[in-house]
Amino acid sequence: MQRSPDGRIPESSKLSWMLLATKKPGKGDTGSMSTADRLTKAGYIHQSSAGIYTLLPLAQRVVAKITRIVDEEMRAVGGQRLAMPSLLGPAGWQATGRWESTRGELFTLEDRRASLLLLAPTHEEEVTAIVKHMVRSYLQLPLRLFQVTRKFRDEARPRAGLLRAREFIMKDMYSFDVDETRAVQTFDEVERAYRRCFDRIGVPYAVAEADSGNIGGALSKEFHFVSSAGEDTLLVCRGCGYSANTERARAGRGTERGADVHRVVVRGAEDRMVSEFRVVVPAGHRPNPLKIKAVWPVAVHENLELTLVGQFGADEAAALSQAVTSASGSDSDLGYETESGAIKCLVDMLVDNQLADTVRAIGTVQLGDWHLAQAGDACSKCESGTLEAQQAIEVGHIFHLGDKYSKALDLTVLNQGQRSYVQMGCYGIGISRILQAAAECSNADGRGLRWPVAIAPYLATIVPLDGSDRVAELFAMLADMRVRGVRVSEDNVVVDDRDYLSAGFRLNDAQLLGIPVTVVLGRRFKLASEVEVQLRVPGLTLPPEVAGVAVRGDAYEHKAYVHVDKLVEFLTCAFGSHTQI
């Protein structure tokens, strides 16, 4: 953006020109208000219907900054940006089996010819078809293709604002490599790029081992913003840094434990019971359905669902231990025949050693890791630490897919005279989720939001209560300011010129909007050329004096009166050791 030749402030940098209708929080709202409500009251989002939101101009600015960071880091690892259609045919999804397995989450429709279509929740099938059409030789690999588009998912219970929306903005990248070794190298390289993205965004985050779910693949990691309000639970070891979600986490052996017995019912596509069997897990733990399903012959029974049917008491657990001790081969009364004849009884390897050793000698019992880890368990990585629960909000997920999609859709390349399936990966970042998650994690107080500097809609707002004849001068000063060598720019400064509102309303709005720097031109500006500077920056801690200026404040906000000639020096020092713009 360029300033007008006569030095005037562009209309686009004035709040009077913006679609903005804030609502002051009520007295009872300060502690209980959800982040989605805060964003609504601050004029960032507007709910259209359940799980569907309009991103208003301020939110769109935040999204644009998040997208710019992600775009730069994806291009830095060789990503090429494209835009695939949101409206897709079902053929690819039927070929991979996801048309049936995810049908409940798909928005489907028919055109005037009664042809089925779907609104894309993700694009593995489509991008595989594109590469199949255009790539013939391994010499055309690797490829890393990404997009930032709207996605659609029929959430059963849309809630929590943008965190569980039915329409959302997502960055998804897809990688194509000639073999597994190079595909895993790509996975590691993109993981590092993701870390750079979240480092730049400036919200504390965790990287956790994860289950691949319906996407598929054997290698998977999640990126989470750490927040006590998060719906996800991570299990972390403070000793060695191990981190995983509860479905994926593995517990170490620790102390010897007794056993609890659970009955698992396996149901088919038409809710018919295929079979049932017993799972023996450490006392006080629950079986892990994802780990159990991984060993079930899904190829024999499509769309299997595992249902945990209660927990047997201590008496039956003792009886089971006795039964295992005395059992031999197929005479064991623990086993339940399946249609494939594969599984009799699953016994967790972390039950007491005597029982585990006995189980190893019984051919009809399968020993493995069948339980859900929980806080207090020993860490399986370092074997000396203890797992702790940590609440978090998922904002990114990366997968090594292998040949799941390339094999289903017959994507091959010619390599040394042989045709081989391409190895794939997919990498998602929830752009609109980050918008709300960052607001959630930045410790808003009763006065309003607090945005990380890198993604705030504006770096600074000027509130002229007096001395308005010098507003253009201050605007130019802030726009030309450099922090860590980067010019702030006119597009990052806004003036609250809404003279029709009271001074108190505009000052409250400055806090409500969460813009990091507020410069107030009041009486002291007219009398002594001093402006009041308010800093609302997550994680910013300042000493009592910065650049010779006295600073006062609390955990949420810092204030100082600064002579206009020292304003740039003061802000440069305040931000210089904190973050980058």
Outline where the language-model segments fall.
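NTP/phosphate- and nucleic-acid-binding module
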Residues: 1-581
